[in-house]
Amino acid sequence: MELHLALRASPLPAADPGRRPPPPRGNFATNCTAAINSTHISQEKFRSLDSWVEHNMLTFLKPVEKCWQPQDFLPDPSHLSAEELGDAVREIHERAAEIPDEVWVCMVGNMVTEEALPTYQSLISSVLGGTVAGSTPWDRWIRGWSAEENRHGDLLNKYLYLTGRLDMRQVEKTIQYLIGSGMDVGVGNSILCGFIYTCFQEKATFIPHGNTARLAKHHGDTTLAKICGLVAADEKRHAAAYTNLMRKLFEVDPNESMLAFAHVMQARVTMPASRMFDGRDPHLFTHFSDVSQKIGVYTVGDYSEMLDFFLKEWDISAIVDGLSPEGRRVQEYVCGLPEVMRKLAERADDRRKKLVNVGEPRYIPFSWIFNKQVRV
């Protein structure tokens, strides 16, 4: 939340005389959707990438027979006696016993985010205008990507249930609320903005799963660590596919891609699970995010590093040909954002340290862990 407020407050470079001025700062949020919807790549240019997607994006998907499946990491009642099954579940309980409540909050938040996959598939399909049975490379990518992603929430949900550490009815309610609430990520119907947003979110999903894997291993649950690590590896592979796609789109239409990049950065783009609700806590996503920030699962600093990564991957500062005056102006803007974010991260860290040292500690109850309180 703090990050997006800072980005909105960060001004675009001053325009030269005669150039179209930037929208007034006070009206930017109101006019953001209209501005984003104006960043279009032509259908001719977009469809010219069909062959490229076939040979450079679909290759990031794995054949089903070579993919891990959730059952590979769960007790199998069809092959175990009742006593053996009980022993297997007790082993999971024992491994999970030392994991702190704050880590479980992050595990559940990550899993709930994964379980809202129907919303994400609908978002990408609506941006691309695909069909459920289409045969274009784009249609096949959406379905293949979604099929791989589906295993993530499935496995995490089942394993977390078996730990016995969670109020699964509250977790299940949270999932239903989140899918039912939909999502407005602030990218309008722009293909370019949609893909840039997805690049950030795939990488932003990889980071917390990798960090929860590290925490699970530290606290003795090597199986849960492996599960989180496998999910992180999938997310990293998917992020690489979308990153490669945007690199190609910057080649095909550098000006519109640059404008889209700036719009996504300056708009108050929401996180996928920002409408998270458990029927009790109206600020559940904020509280979950606070815990993630506190224990280092996902931080403002991670976001800053992501932006640095994409600026280098897409070689943003080196793009010269094909940019309009407005394109060059927003290029300067996005190249200056990492420094803005670093300063924001430093200020946020300073505030957290002061809060720790001054006044009473702040605790938040989470229904997912039977209303036990977690310090934030």
From Swiss-Prot:
One of its GO terms (biological process) is fatty acid biosynthetic process. Fe cation 2 binds at E149, E202, E235, H238. One of its GO terms (cellular component) is chloroplast stroma. Pathway: Lipid metabolism; fatty acid metabolism. Transmembrane segments: none annotated. The keyword DNA damage does not apply. Pfam families: FA_desaturase_2. Preferentially expressed in the flower labellum. Converts stearoyl-ACP to oleoyl-ACP by introduction of a cis double bond between carbons 9 and 10 of the acyl chain. Converts palmitoyl-ACP to (4Z)-hexadec-4-enoyl-ACP by introduction of a cis double bond between carbons 4 and 5 of the acyl chain. Catalyzes the desaturation of saturated fatty acid 18:0 and 16:0 to generate 18:1 (delta-9) and 16:1 (delta-4) intermediates, expected to give rise to 9-alkenes and 12-alkenes, respectively. This is Palmitoyl-[acyl-carrier-protein] 4-desaturase 2, chloroplastic. The lineage of its organism: Eukaryota, Viridiplantae, Streptophyta, Embryophyta, Tracheophyta.
